[in-house]
Amino acid sequence: MASVAVENYLKSMWELGPADVATQELAQHLAVAPASVTRMLQRLSERGLVAHTPYRGASLTAAGERKALTVVRRHRLLETFLARTLDLGRDQLHDEAERLEHALSPALERAIDDYLDNPQRDPHGHPIPGPQGELPPEGDSPLGGWPLDRPATVSQVPDRDAGMLGWLESQGLVPGCELRMVARDPFDGGVTVKLDGRLLQVAASVAEEVRVSDGGAV
């Protein structure tokens, strides 16, 4: 088994978890055939990296989660490095980091971490796991469920959808920006927020991907 494939599977399961991940869901996430996923899960189970129940899905074991978080750490450090040193846009970072993350040695990982002064979050606002895989507790919520008339600060935006990221960037809806929830459509779940002195309508699908926390005085 190629280590790149193993790392991709483990990282994808971590992203889709923590509950059991269905074979079909994992196949869609990785853009591979369900039969290929089933075979790989069986092999990962034999290696003690996943707990796999046929027809019910799979979840990471403690060993599998540690390996997954190692890849997540590399990926998010690389995104941060590429943004700070090469000034790549947020919509470019994910794909470039995907290509590089499997080739990053532990020594280079430490060097990048030191060079960046041990960053806590990547440019999308996602927490960067520590060297032992430790993650801070999440204290943010999806924008779609944020209370009306309550100020908030955007903490995270999605990293996989370049089109969505491009739109968020164009509207200034990025980590660190301050907003206030103004209205929520009771039918389609879309929201209206006040951002930079203007009203912005955000589709439900986007509002569920953007995460916010308390803060701001908009």
Model-predicted regions and their roles:
Residues 45-55:
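A short, conserved structural fragment
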Residues 35, 91:
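Key DNA-contact positions within bacterial/archaeal DNA-binding proteins
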Residues 102-209:
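Mid-protein regulatory/catalytic core that forms ligand/cofactor-binding pockets
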Residues 23-24, 42, 62, 80:
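Residues within the helices of the helix-turn-helix
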Residues 9, 26, 37-47, 168, ...:
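Basic amphipathic alpha-helical segments that dock to polyanions
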Residues 1-32:
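N-terminal helix-turn-helix DNA-binding core of bacterial DNA-binding proteins
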Residues 56-75:
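Basic, amphipathic "hinge/linker" alpha-helix immediately C-terminal to the N-terminal HTH DNA-binding motif
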